[in-house]
Curated annotation (Swiss-Prot):
Catalytic function, reaction form: 7-aminomethyl-7-carbaguanine + guanosine(34) in tRNA = 7-aminomethyl-7-carbaguanosine(34) in tRNA + guanine
Alphabetical GO biological process terms: queuosine biosynthetic process; tRNA wobble guanine modification; tRNA-guanine transglycosylation
Pfam family, one: TGT
Binding site for substrate: D93, S94, G95, G96, F97, D147, Q198, G225
Function: Catalyzes the base-exchange of a guanine (G) residue with the queuine precursor 7-aminomethyl-7-deazaguanine (PreQ1) at position 34 (anticodon wobble position) in tRNAs with GU(N) anticodons (tRNA-Asp, -Asn, -His and -Tyr). Catalysis occurs through a double-displacement mechanism. The nucleophile active site attacks the C1' of nucleotide 34 to detach the guanine base from the RNA, forming a covalent enzyme-RNA intermediate. The proton acceptor active site deprotonates the incoming PreQ1, allowing a nucleophilic attack on the C1' of the ribose to form the product.
Pathway this chain belongs to: tRNA modification; tRNA-queuosine biosynthesis
GO cellular component, one term: cytosol
Native organism taxonomy: Bacteria, Bacillati, Bacillota, Clostridia, Eubacteriales
Cofactor note: Binds 1 zinc ion per subunit.
Binding, Zn(2+): C313, C315, C318, H344
Alphabetized InterPro entries for the sequence: ArchSynthase1/Queuine_TRR, TGT, TGT-like_sf, tRNA_ribo_trans-like
Keyword Kinase: no
Protein's recorded name: Queuine tRNA-ribosyltransferase
Gene name, Swiss-Prot/TrEMBL: tgt
């Protein structure tokens, strides 16, 4: 039996307010994880900044860190927490999504995936055991199982075959994680493993897979293979189908889905964990989130705008600078422009999750969601 780590504190409809205890601190859920692909948020945002803007969990990428600086180097430096000076939880993805996004550069076999590095073209092999070994070297708080992220659309026949293989890979991940956690030189002997539900947009395949993996007694469960081309309606349909078949005493993680409106819809359906590169990527291009939805600071109408990005926001950008100044920085190609907008967007997301938790605690989540969607009016 896995150690009990998740406590459901309150439900408001299907929306869940919980706590997830980890070796690196307790996570208050629902939670948005801030994505630092190479152990840093793109846009010159440091681990100290992340604490200032209310980040609970940082997410790093196994595939990219394996290529550079190399997971063995990170292990020699004491693991990711020590390497990037971050003492709160870290989740590492399995590398699966990146490997499968290489399309023409990879071959899938039962033992794993053969692919070419996107950096120098060298041949690399990654399977369940290799993914677990890399993540163990990184020493993250939560490791993700190695799975195939199925492209959309895919035939039913292919999806069934892929999901069966992903299940076999999950069994191998669990066995290897148990072995690694027992070794004397392991960075984090309490590293946790989340399994990933797959099945494309086929609800019956998704449900059967959820029923199968919930029996494996993992630390948490993710819904993967979404935000890859399906409509929002299809995505919500899959969440509605899967969530009732996952354990209520474990966190549920919707991978890679990150529009604020998507988050509200998924929380309403019982999801606890979220991540997405979207707020940082948008920020680097001057697209920032506000109470009224997303705006583009590059627009000429902000040239003389003396307001902060978002009135009342307590992020470092809004407390100190105007829209006009930040727009000027972008036009002048100053790096500070990206930094300020990334900080703002991540603060916006972290504050949104805090407000969501308060709404569930207070029993007014439905009203909160309706008000937010009305304010954003399709712009977030």
């Amino acid at each position: 039996m896995t150690k009990k780590r998740y406590t459901l504190l309150k439900k408001d409809g299907k929306a869940r307010r919980g706590e997830f205890v980890t070796p690196h601190g307790t996570i208050q859920t629902p939670i948005f994880m801030n994505v630092g692909t190479l152990a840093a948020i793109k846009g010159a945002v440091s681990s100290m900044d992340l604490k200032e803007i209310g980040c609970q969990v940082e997410l790093s990428n196994t595939y990219h860190l394996h290529l550079r600086p190399g997971d063995k180097i990170v292990k020699q430096m004491g693991g990711l927490h020590n390497f990037m000076n971050w003492d709160r939880p870290i989740l590492t993805d399995s590398g699966g999504f990146q490997v499968f996004s290489l399309a023409g550069m990879r071959k899938i076999k039962e033992e794993g995936v053969y692919f070419n590095s996107h950096i120098d073209g060298r041949k690399i092999f990654m399977g369940p055991e290799e993914s677990m070994q890399i993540q163990s070297n990184l020493g993250s708080t939560i490791a993700m199982a190695f799975d195939e992220c199925i492209p959309n659309p895919s035939t039913r026949e292919y999806v069934e075959k892929s999901v069966a293989r992903t299940t076999r890979w999950l069994e191998r991940c669990k066995k290897e994680m148990d072995r690694l956690n027992s070794l004397d030189d392991t960075v984090n002997k309490e590293q946790m493993l989340f399994g990933i539900n797959q099945g494309g947009v086929y609800e019956d395949i998704r449900i059967e897979h959820a029923k199968t993996i919930r029996e494996m007694d993992l630390d948490g469960y993710a819904i993967g293979g979404l935000a890859v081309g399906e409509t929002h309606e299809e995505m919500y349909r899959v969440i509605d189908a899967v969530v009732p078949h996952l354990p209520e005493d474990k966190p549920i993680y919707l991978m890679g889905v990150g529009l604020p409106s998507n988050i509200l819809e998924a929380v309403e359906r019982g999801v606890d964990f979220f991540d997405c590169v979207l707020p940082a990527r948008n920020g680097r291009h001057g697209h920032v989130f506000t109470k009224e939805g997303k705006i583009n600071l590059m627009n000429a109408k902000f040239e003389l705008d003396a307001r902060p990005i978002d009135e009342g926001c307590q992020c470092p950008a809004c407390k100190n600078y105007t829209r006009a100044y930040i727009r000027h920085l972008f036009k002048a190609k100053e790096m500070l422009a990206m930094r300020l907008c990334v900080l703002h967007n991540l603060y916006f997301y972290n504050k949104l999750m805090e407000d969501i938790r308060d709404a569930i605690d207070g029993g007014y989540f439905a009203e909160f969601k309706a008000k937010k969607l009305e304010e954003w009016n399709g712009r977030a």
